[in-house]
Amino acid sequence: MRLTSEARSIIVNRIADFSIEVGKQPVTIGQWLYMRPNMFLKIENYIPLKKFVQTDNIDDLFEFESEEEKETLLNKYRTLRYEQATTNTTLKE
């Protein structure tokens, strides 16, 4: 799993603003970008990431190796549950 090139570019260009938003040092954000991209799946980091990249689509933020990896990581960090809880969609019958 890794961030898409577009998402990574936005964070790199605005790393100071993003680090203030998440309350971490820019060096820490830099390590996350290249060595620990799963840290962006934590809800406290995921919400600012969506705000900075200006998208609600998980596939615009991350590139996963497989659907199994995607499902496993989204469930582990409860990102999928958060997305479902905040989405205001109703099923039409």
Task: Indicate residue ranges for each PLM-predicted region.
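Phosphate-coordinating loops and pocket residues in cytosolic domains that bind phosphorylated ligands
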Residues: 31-34, 63
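A generic structural signal for ordered secondary structure
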Residues: 17-22, 41, 46, 61-62
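A short, Lys/Arg-rich alpha-helix, primarily the initiator
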Residues: 1-21
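Short, charged recognition helix plus adjacent turn
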Residues: 59-93
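Short, flexible helical or helix-coil boundary motifs
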Residues: 10, 22, 36, 56, ...
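Short coil turns linking two alpha-helices in DNA-binding domains
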Residues: 14, 25-30, 42
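Secretory-pathway ectodomains
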Residues: 1-2, 21-25, 49-55
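Short, basic-rich loop-to-helix N-cap that marks the start of a DNA-contacting helix
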Residues: 35-51
